[in-house]
Amino acid sequence: MLPQRIFFTGVPGSRWSGIAQTLETIPGFNTSDRTAERTYNHHSYSGHKGAYFGWGMEFEPIVLWNNPDHIDQAWTEPGGTRLVKSHNWPDKFEKIEKRFPDDWIMLVYRPDQAAFAWWHEAGGFQIKYPDYSWYVDSNTMMYEIARSNKLMLDYACQKHATWNYFTTDWIKENFGADIEVSTIHSDILVTLIK
C-alpha cells in the first residue's frame, strides 16, 4: 500500500524530475499540484511539473515542521499519494522521519559533475521554475550539489538502503505497478526508504 506522502529528493541536474513524472503515472498518485505556473519545459523534455518545496519557493521547508498541513496545500484534490519534491530534503531526513513516520523517502543520486553539467544544459539560473536564485552562483551550486549528494549517500548508508537503476522492474518491485521506463541512465541511481 502506498503512503500518503513520499518525500522525494535529488540534486539539481540529477534528472529527478523525469523520474518523478514517471512515478506519478502510477495509479493512486495525486498530481493536482500541477499548474501552468509550476511548469518548466526545456529541450524536448517536460522539465519540471508540480509543486517544488524549497528556499525562496512558494512552499518553504521550514514551515513544514510547524504546520504539516502546509504540505498538503499544494494539492487541490484530496487523497492519493503525494510526491513531495525538494532539493532541500537532505538537510531534513531525521525531521521528516519523526514528523511523518508513515511516509517514505526516495533519493535520486547522480554524480556531482554530471548533475552540475546537466543542470546548466537544462537552463541553469535561467530556469523559471523552480527558483534557483538562493544558490546565488555556479560555485555555490556545485558546492550544494556535492554537499547534498554526500548527505544522501550517508543517509542511505545509515539506513542500509540499496541503490538501483531506475527501471521497470524496480518500479514493479517497490510500487507494484507495471510502468515502462523508456530510458535507463547508467549514472543515475535511486533508493527508497520505507
List the predicted regions and their residue ranges.
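Structured mid-to-C-terminal alpha-helical surface segments
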Residues: 177, 186-192
